[in-house]
């Protein structure tokens, strides 16, 4: 039986909004405008969370700045998916002790997935005394009252509720782009892959109600947003906890029929919950980009079982082949882990052969990183680091060759793009499949859809000319 999502009551959110007003009044009484810096690590969900943090800070009277130097409030939104990300966070948080020494009144907060791990919170308490506050993803909506408490008392605060999570609607947002927007449709994950810390720190799956999502998307379209991405740890599970008979494909179809000129994307998916219905929906509606990020992680059944992925190589390939059969221009991307505990050379070769079979447009490749508290962290791992690095390099070489071959096939073709900025002397744009295109043009094209003819390519990007 699916759990019903816990929705934060409107009166509680109104209380937080009132606190924002009180903080704003406090700074007005001091005769100056405070500044805040938000630093984000990790995935797109963290980016979306940081936009809400910036929204609450702006509602509290803060000017959002792009450096920690001289900021009155610093918020670091952390990532726990790999050891490298955590190491960077610890290093940067440690360096802030010098920044705070120059600005003693500065308030420093840590949030995000690392703060969902008790051992991390204890380390922050004991070894990073210059940090004023900590809150985990479930407590994000309470940030105004946490900030107010620290401002009033100068006492450290740790809000690390261990609940299964919640949903808070109507939190103010300061988006990082006026062209592209993230829309969280659900939070948490129920899958418990053996290597992944996310379900432990993000909680169980909770879906937003479809009418709330539609209202947000309508507002974005009205504001001129052209590229909208629906976010969730596993969007394919959307709606299962609501009991409304609305699944992810239904939600996508409803959004795709809204008036306006925009592209609709989504991430991330889990293959065990992907369906032909979803592929059919993508194929049916022009506004849904012909792009599917479908992480396979390994091409070997024994490794997939050890990862607790709940699908086989054959089941995955059937999905990928079906998508390409009904949409020959479908852009397929994926995640893959190299060096999972116990992976043999033959099992690694199964991963290589799957990549050759599917011919992904791009891969996000990682060497296995053990996460404390996950089953995989306790597995015997006899493969030397040097061997893992060799396999990683070989896999990247294979994928880079395939990516270049696919890009070479675009030369001479005309594609639709959305121009998103300038890089030195060239404009940059993205195809609906997310490919980077560089071309000469005027800045007036930024934010517009138009056609370009591809004249050249590299492994990672295309070069084009305006039609």
Segments the model singles out, each with a brief description of its role:
Residues 1, 6, 378-467:
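Terminal RNA-binding accessory module
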Residues 1-238, 277, 292, 314-325, ...:
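Proteins enriched for Cys/Gly/acidic motifs involved in redox and nucleic-acid/cofactor modification
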Residues 80-81, 202-203, 242-245, 305-311, ...:
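Short glycine-enriched, charge-decorated loop/helix-capping segments at active-site entrances
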Residues 105-110, 118-119, 222-345:
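Conserved SAM/AdoMet-binding glycine-rich loop
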Residues 176-179, 189-191, 288, 298, ...:
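Short flexible coil/turn linkers enriched for glycine and charged/polar residues
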Residues 193, 213, 230, 266, ...:
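Conserved, mostly hydrophobic/aromatic
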Residues 343, 358-360:
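Contiguous mid-protein beta-loop-alpha structural module that forms a pocket-lining wall or clamp
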Residues 347-353:
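Short, acidic/polar
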């Amino acid at each position: 039986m699916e759990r019903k999502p816990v929705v934060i009551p409107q009166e509680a959110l109104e209380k937080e909004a009132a606190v924002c007003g009180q903080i704003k009044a406090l700074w007005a009484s001091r005769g100056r405008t405070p500044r805040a810096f938000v630093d984000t690590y990790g995935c797109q969900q963290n980016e979306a969370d940081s936009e809400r943090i910036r929204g609450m800070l702006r509602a509290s009277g803060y000017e959002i700045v792009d450096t920690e130097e001289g900021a009155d409030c610093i918020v670091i939104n952390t990532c726990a998916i790999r050891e490298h990300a955590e190491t960077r966070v610890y290093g940067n948080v440690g360096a802030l002790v010098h920044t705070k020494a120059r600005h003693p009144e500065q308030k420093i907060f840590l949030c995000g997935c690392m703060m969902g791990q008790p051992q991390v919170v204890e380390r922050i308490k004991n070894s990073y005394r210059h940090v004023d506050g900590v809150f985990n993803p479930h407590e994000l909506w309470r940030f105004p009252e946490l900030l107010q408490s620290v401002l009033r008392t100068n006492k450290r605060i740790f809000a690390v509720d261990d609940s299964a999570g919640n949903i808070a609607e109507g939190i103010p947002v300061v988006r990082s782009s006026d062209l592209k927007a993230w829309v969280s449709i659900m939070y948490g994950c129920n899958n418990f892959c053996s290597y992944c810390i996310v379900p432990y720190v993000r909680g169980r799956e909770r879906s937003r109600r479809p009418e709330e999502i539609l209202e947000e998307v309508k507002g974005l379209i009205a504001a001129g947003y052209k590229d909208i991405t629906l976010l969730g740890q596993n969007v394919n599970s959307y709606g299962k906890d609501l009991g409304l008979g609305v699944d992810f494909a239904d939600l996508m179809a409803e959004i795709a029929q809204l008036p306006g000129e925009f592209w609709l994307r989504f991430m991330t998916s889990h293959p065990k919950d992907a369906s032909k219905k979803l592929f059919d929906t993508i194929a049916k509606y022009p506004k849904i980009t012909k792009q599917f990020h479908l992480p396979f992680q390994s091409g070997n059944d024994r490794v997939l079982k050890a990862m607790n992925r709940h699908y086989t190589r054959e089941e995955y390939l059937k999905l990928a082949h079906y998508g390409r059969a009904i949409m020959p221009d479908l852009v397929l991307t994926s995640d893959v882990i190299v060096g999972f505990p116990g992976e043999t050379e033959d099992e690694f070769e199964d991963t290589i052969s799957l990549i050759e079979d599917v011919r992904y447009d791009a891969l996000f490749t990682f060497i296995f990183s053990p996460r404390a508290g996950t089953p995989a962290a306790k597995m015997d791992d006899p493969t030397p680091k040097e061997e893992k690095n060799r396999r990683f390099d070989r896999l990247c070489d294979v994928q880079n060759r395939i990516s270049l071959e696919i890009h070479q096939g675009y030369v001479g073709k005309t594609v639709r793009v959305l121009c998103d900025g300038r890089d030195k002397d060239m404009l940059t744009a993205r195809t609906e499949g997310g490919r980077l295109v560089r071309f000469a043009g005027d800045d007036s094209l930024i934010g517009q859809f138009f056609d370009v003819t591809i004249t050249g390519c590299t492994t990672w990007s295309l070069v084009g000319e305006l039609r």
